[in-house]
């Protein structure tokens, strides 16, 4: 009887794992390799350093925003160069450009109330706030 349960439960578990997608705050970027490399170079970050910093294992570290300023400036650079614009001409969030849902807009706005004035830290915080708000919605296709 136990084996029959496994026959039905195992495929269900596999299905759930296949539907689950790992999310990371940097999943928002539509990477252009040249822009990515230029942003790293401008901020004096090697590929190895970036890979170590951007791993899923460092997610709590990122969400606590205890990140060196050069990494925050790299995120600002990526936001400025990304094909999906989140920042207005003044370097501040633009919820219309971000195409947020009402729920995400409220959450992001509340989270950004205590955003730092410094533009690199501000941009980094915006990405973290959007991630916490579940924005953008990742398509399952």
Curated annotation (Swiss-Prot):
GO terms for biological process: response to odorant; sensory perception of chemical stimulus; sensory perception of smell. GO terms for molecular function: odorant binding. Coiled coil: none annotated. One of its GO terms (cellular component) is extracellular region. Disulfide bonds join 39-77, 73-120, 111-129. It comes from the Eukaryota. Gene3D superfamilies: Pheromone/general odorant binding protein domain (1.10.238.20). This is General odorant-binding protein 57b. It comes from Drosophila melanogaster (Fruit fly). The gene is Obp57b.
